[in-house]
């Protein structure tokens, strides 16, 4: 019961395909839809097989630099098998959220930030344990470090010079700091409080006279509350200090000839629409003020946004939203029970419904039973297992035992490293649009490409097509030779041709040539007339000057090629030389 109970904050496996590895996600919320189903709002984690080849190289470079800086080498004592399996435990965190049906959850796992003080073998020794150190942004395809680094060592630390003898400080102390209040003033606390009450009253009266403030603060109570904020009190205390704590002169400054002084803070400077935008941005980005300013409030300064945030937290609106969020969190689902589902569709079973014990002793829904004889596990090469699973495209006839199949689903790779994995560099992923068209189906799924020798496994030929040139295009080639310049264009295939200039020149030349008559094509005489003319006028044979017999050189004679008795290929029972237009070895003999 507890194994199938999933709560908010758990790291879980999600199955989006019966043949692909599990997705690794962290549950953020559990929401119940209108239809009664449960959806999970999750944070996405990506495997190495999910990102591009370039980013994998950057991640390996970052890991190598981290290993060089650390005192204990990370992969010094690891075998090739352990290094291969360690790559399957590495994940990449993302800030991307998605909603998935809770019924697709297939188990729990554990994901932690890479601990540099802990041995990497601890991740291999624990089941369903993963680690991450970099953050992947799927929108811009970049990798970033998830935590800041404290760089320790002579490379990053400053050289501390020797202590110098004490000298007199020649700096002007008046420029270093400014005194704004004197606690030893001649006024008592009661007199200062009375002056602050006068400053609040002046601020309330100033808001009553200001038209824009009257719109924002329609009632006297709200105007008095706005005048009682810190900016009014700070201005009053600063005015009192600047006038030597003389109450009469300070009050005269608060109420000059032009009218009372009005002091506003960020709460009053912001409009209602700007406040709504700020709350929307805060709901989306949290306290990431740089993103809030960039996407929602670019006309506000960062200082203004931060100041408004801490003032906004003191308002009743913030308290109300906090209570609403607490009530929503209380009403949301805290956990969900997902029962064990039916067997995987890739499971191979015999005709009587019992699981096979030997790979090849049972049949599948894809291949006949005779085609599976002698097939072993593609990962560990075992020939016996209590259950077998079809792996890869059906025409590949690949199978995995129960242990390797579970490893493939959880960790996204084969348990045992293959020779091709050791020799080749990481292949491009399906996310790269330039490489996707050149990858086969099994390569897109991260499976090895195997050549079985069967014509079924060959790549299908694409549908043939041809490009038909229009009549006007053929005319434009002749009319616009100076602009088109076909020879230069052929030598530069990646430089675009200016079709607009060609079209304009063709229109001008076509108007010029439309008035001139076209040259009529000469009609060809029939063959009977040509034969009659040749009979009447036979061709004269040229006089050939023959040399004496002693000066004649032996004429060479080309002999037929000797038959090539090499082995016949499948291509029409002819060898490679015949299919490429070659006659084999030739011998030249003199007559």
UniProtKB/Swiss-Prot annotation:
UniProt cross-references to PROSITE patterns, sorted A to Z: BAH, ELM2, SANT
UniProt keyword Cytoplasm present: yes
Tissue: Expressed in heart, brain, spleen, lung, liver and kidney.
Residue numbers bearing the Phosphoserine modification: 425, 427, 516
Skewed-composition ranges (Basic and acidic residues): 421-435
Subunit organization: Component of the nucleosome remodeling and deacetylase (NuRD) repressor complex, composed of core proteins MTA1, MTA2, MTA3, RBBP4, RBBP7, HDAC1, HDAC2, MBD2, MBD3, and peripherally associated proteins CDK2AP1, CDK2AP2, GATAD2A, GATAD2B, CHD3, CHD4 and CHD5. The exact stoichiometry of the NuRD complex is unknown, and some subunits such as MBD2 and MBD3, GATAD2A and GATAD2B, and CHD3, CHD4 and CHD5 define mutually exclusive NuRD complexes. Interacts with BCL6. Interacts with NACC2. Interacts with PWWP2B.
Function: Acts as a component of the histone deacetylase NuRD complex which participates in the remodeling of chromatin. Plays a role in maintenance of the normal epithelial architecture through the repression of SNAI1 transcription in a histone deacetylase-dependent manner, and thus the regulation of E-cadherin levels. Contributes to transcriptional repression by BCL6.
Homology family: Belongs to the metastasis-associated protein family.
Protein name listed in UniProt: Metastasis-associated protein MTA3
Source organism: Mus musculus (Mouse)
């Amino acid at each position: 019961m507890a194994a199938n109970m999933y709560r908010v904050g758990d790291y879980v496996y999600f199955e989006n395909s019966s043949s692909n590895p599990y997705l690794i996600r962290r549950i953020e919320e559990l929401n119940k839809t209108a239809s009664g189903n449960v959806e999970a709002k999750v944070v996405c984690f990506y495997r190495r097989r999910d990102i591009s080849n370039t980013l994998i190289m950057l991640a390996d470079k970052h890991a190598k630099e981290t290993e060089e800086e650390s005192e204990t080498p990370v992969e010094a004592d690891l075998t090739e098998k352990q290094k291969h399996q360690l790559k399957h435990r590495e994940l990449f965190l993302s800030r991307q959220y998605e909603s998935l049906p809770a019924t697709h959850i297939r188990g729990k796992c554990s994901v932690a930030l890479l601990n540099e003080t802990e041995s990497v073998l601890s991740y291999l020794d624990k089941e369903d344990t993963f680690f991450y150190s970099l953050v992947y942004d799927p929108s811009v395809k970049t990798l970033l470090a998830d935590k800041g680094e404290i760089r320790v060592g002579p490379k990053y630390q400053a050289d501390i010079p020797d202590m110098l003898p004490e000298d007199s400080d020649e700096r002007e102390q008046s420029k270093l700091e400014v005194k704004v209040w004197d606690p030893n003033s001649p006024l008592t606390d009661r007199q200062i409080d009375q002056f602050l009450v006068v400053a609040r009253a002046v601020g309330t009266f100033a808001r009553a006279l200001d038209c824009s403030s009257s719109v924002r603060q329609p009632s006297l109570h709200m105007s008095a509350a706005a005048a009682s904020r810190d900016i009014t009190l700070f201005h009053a205390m600063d005015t009192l200090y600047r006038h030597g704590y003389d109450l009469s002169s300070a009050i005269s400054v608060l109420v000059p000839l032009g009218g009372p002084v009005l002091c506003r803070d960020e709460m009053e400077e912001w409009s209602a629409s700007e406040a709504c935008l700020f709350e929307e941005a805060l709901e989306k980005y949290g306290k990431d003020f740089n993103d809030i300013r960039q996407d929602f409030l670019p006309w506000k300064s960062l200082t203004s946004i931060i100041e408004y945030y801490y003032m906004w937290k003191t308002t009743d609106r913030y308290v109300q939203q906090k209570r609403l969020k607490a009530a929503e969190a209380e009403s949301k689902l805290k956990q969900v029970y997902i029962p064990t589902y039916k067997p995987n569709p890739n499971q191979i079973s015999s005709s009587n419904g019992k699981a096979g014990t030997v790979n090849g002793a049972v049949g599948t829904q894809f291949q006949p039973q005779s085609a599976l004889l002698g097939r072993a596990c593609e990962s560990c090469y075992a020939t016996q297992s209590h259950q077998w699973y079809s792996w890869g495209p059906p025409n590949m006839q690949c199978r995995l035992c129960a242990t390797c199949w579970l490893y493939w689903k959880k960790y996204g790779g084969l348990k045992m490293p293959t020779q091709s994995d050791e020799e080749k560099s990481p292949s491009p992923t399906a996310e790269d649009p330039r490489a996707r068209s050149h990858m086969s189906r099994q390569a897109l799924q991260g499976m090895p490409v195997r050549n079985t020798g069967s014509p079924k496994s060959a790549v299908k030929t694409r549908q043939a097509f041809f490009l038909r040139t229009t009549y006007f295009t053929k005319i434009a080639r002749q009319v616009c030779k100076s602009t088109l310049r076909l020879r230069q264009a052929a030598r530069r295939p990646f430089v675009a041709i200016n079709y607009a200039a060609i079209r304009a020149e063709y229109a001008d030349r076509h108007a010029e040539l439309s008035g001139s008559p076209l040259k009529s094509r000469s009609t060809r005489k029939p063959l009977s007339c040509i034969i009659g003319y040749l009979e009447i006028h036979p061709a004269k044979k040229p006089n050939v000057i023959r040399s004496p017999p002693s000066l004649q050189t032996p004429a060479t004679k080309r002999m037929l090629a000797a038959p090539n008795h090499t082995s016949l290929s499948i291509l029409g029972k002819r060898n490679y030389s015949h299919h490429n237009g070659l006659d084999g070895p030739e011998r030249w003999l003199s007559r």
